[in-house]
Amino acid sequence: MKFVKYFLILAVCCILLGAGSIYGLYRYIEPQLPDVATLKDVRLQIPMQIYSADGELIAQYGEKRRIPVTLDQIPPEMVKAFIATEDSRFYEHHGVDPVGIFRAASVALFSGHASQGASTITQQLARNFFLSPERTLMRKIKEVFLAIRIEQLLTKDEILELYLNKIYLGYRAYGVGAAAQVYFGKTVDQLTLNEMAVIAGLPKAPSTFNPLYSMDRAVARRNVVLSRMLDEGYITQQQFDQTRTEAINANYHAPEIAFSAPYLSEMVRQEMYNRYGESAYEDGYRIYTTITRKVQQAAQQAVRNNVLDYDMRHGYRGPANVLWKVGESAWDNNKITDTLKALPTYGPLLPAAVTSANPQQATAMLADGSTVALSMEGVRWARPYRSDTQQGPTPRKVTDVLQTGQQIWVRQVGDAWWLAQVPEVNSALVSINPQNGAVMALVGGFDFNQSKFNRATQALRQVGSNIKPFLYTAAMDKGLTLASMLNDVPISRWDASAGSDWQPKNSPPQYAGPIRLRQGLGQSKNVVMVRAMRAMGVDYAAEYLQRFGFPAQNIVHTESLALGSASFTPMQVARGYAVMANGGFLVDPWFISKIENDQGGVIFEAKPKVACPECDIPVIYGDTQKSNVLENNDVEDVAISREQQNVSVPMPQLEQANQALVAKTGAQEYAPHVINTPLAFLIKSALNTNIFGEPGWQGTGWRAGRDLQRRDIGGKTGTTNSSKDAWFSGYGPGVVTSVWIGFDDHRRNLGHTTASGAIKDQISGYEGGAKSAQPAWDAYMKAVLEGVPEQPLTPPPGIVTVNIDRSTGQLANGGNSREEYFIEGTQPTQQAVHEVGTTIIDNGEAQELF
């Protein structure tokens, strides 16, 4: 009896000592324990998703892929699979399972290794939310105490729901919703028992038990899960026997991107990071942009096709690599495909290896092991590239270009395969809605994988003649009209700073004598623009450009500004052209229409300032002081004094502008009105002439009229010195678009090509705005305006139409006439008088008409 008594006393003491030790340990680490109450309002890390305007997914950013699901959305069989595998006594314990611990310890003792885990689902939840993955005794103790706390705070169903959404299941998939999508391309409710068992087997070792890493291990682990489900009575013997014989059909499924717009998506990502920091990638934001599939894909296709066409006409630079030489042993298929799989794809360009070649045809293997045939049709373009200005002879047979062992690039053209190459030239396109600034399409380069540099918004490039419409607008605001006569003859002026004559020339170097301003813009006459610049004053012109949103620091105050020496981005140029297209309003480009949180609540909605040419909104700069000299249509070239320039450039009247920004309803804000609506109409009309010309002459943008077959469009070419940059910018109904093409290496120019009879409809000659950039503009605008009714240019109030003489710009007095638009009060009042010959006054200092 004494032994029993002492034993009981000892047992009680041990219990008290153990309890006291546990309590003391708890009190010691309690301050270090996180507050589990946060689980009540936990926010799971959900990636940011970016959508098009019509709700299609275009990008996803975030380290963790997660698709949150509620417990009632998860099939009961999947819940049971996890419980059977991870914590069979889940509904019986209070966070820690002593029975499970004893069982795991016993197995470890008798087997010599730990084959069973002792952590409950609640402990795993505590570890995943609050603790580091380190394996230490202190971490395990904290895990136990946290699990007990969690059980006191949450119901079993709440714990399960959090666990099944939080657990890591491999391949960046967190939670069963993401795992179902990643491995099987399904939602959880579409999974079979076989697939549920595969996913339920992943928590123990997601990197090695997943079927993408090792199918054998995945099958073995699935069978373990099925066995435990059978032991727990969750499935029948028949289900077990049938399911364990089924194959696992798993593949990696990336997020279901409807279409790609990588440059714009990256702009959205940067904007979201600037607003929300790292939480942008974790809080499940859904961002809706302003682009649509049809328009964006038309832009990408137009840019890529145009870049490839340019690249092809300049010749083939040879294979990307030589894998084995002719005469050497060919590589086996596995080695070829492994090498090709390691290479990127660029848009439509796929890496390939030439496995055989004869004069009529070559065979090339792709990364997936399939082969394609390259006939003479697909390699005929591949004249040897010698320089940007010189190409070799057209190949006569396939083996003039291709040999076995070469690593090349190919692309599909219709049903055929063509030889290709990664282009060295690059391009950008920006398209916006001129009424409110919404970005309709944006392409920052040939391919985002090739270069992430966004040329649409980051590349400052000289704009060439793309600047002329803005400068002519300034000149007309100063007193010129579309009928003003300017002398198209060569200029030669001494430049003291350079120590030489400055001799701007037309391109091509053809001169027509006195011509109207409309023709000067339509034919992009450089010397005519220089004369207009001198007439209105360089400083005035430079400051006027700021009305169109161009940064002052990028504008030079020299006469070379007339030839486009200023550098702007395609986005800035498109914004400027929108002013001319929308009646004179400076809209702000924007690309995010709405941001939702993970619950679908709208936390941001764009409210852009819009153009309203029919509204009575004053120009924020007030009235420009007119020059009496410019208003006189019959004077020689003049240079306005610096004093007159300065006083004639009004500054924005901010108070008036702020009043003008609020509509009569008080709900809609207007964009700043920077040039008056009649003036915007005049330059818009002149841009139309750049495409359609007049009887007797053709505009530099004439190809757009041929390609689009509609007359409600306008635009302007742009080419810089040595053709380093080429542009085409213009408008159509409800759209303004700017296209640039050039080399990132400023030392290279676009060059020229000789015609090859082997290539159908090939562009040849010197590259420039009309040949190098406009084809992309035409192709894009044709796609965007398909089905859009033609909208004739309608003069706004304040515009009068007068019949003028083409040769003098005065009132018509015979058959050589056309109708011309004028701002009311600026129309000519004198009848045209035709004289024999043209007099150019020369007093030793090159004095000419304007």
Curated annotation (Swiss-Prot):
Topological relation to the membrane, as annotated: Single-pass type II membrane protein
Coiled-coil residue spans: none
Region named Transglycosylase: 48-216
Keyword Cell membrane attached: yes
UniProt KW keywords: Antibiotic resistance, Carboxypeptidase, Cell inner membrane, Cell membrane, Cell shape, Cell wall biogenesis/degradation, Glycosyltransferase, Hydrolase, Membrane, Multifunctional enzyme, Peptidoglycan synthesis, Protease, Signal-anchor, Transferase, Transmembrane, Transmembrane helix
Enzyme Commission identifier(s): 2.4.99.28, 3.4.16.4
Residues that span the membrane, as ranges: 6-26
Pfam families on file: PCB_OB, Transgly, Transpeptidase
Positions of the UniProt region annotated as Transpeptidase: 400-710
Active site: 86 (proton donor), 465 (acyl-ester intermediate)
Compartment annotation: Cell inner membrane
Gene Ontology process terms (BP): cell wall organization; peptidoglycan biosynthetic process; proteolysis; regulation of cell shape; response to antibiotic
Protein family per UniProt: In the N-terminal section; belongs to the glycosyltransferase 51 family. In the C-terminal section; belongs to the transpeptidase family.
The protein's role, per its UniProt record: Cell wall formation. Synthesis of cross-linked peptidoglycan from the lipid intermediates. The enzyme has a penicillin-insensitive transglycosylase N-terminal domain (formation of linear glycan strands) and a penicillin-sensitive transpeptidase C-terminal domain (cross-linking of the peptide subunits).
Protein name: Penicillin-binding protein 1A
Provenance organism: Escherichia coli (strain K12)
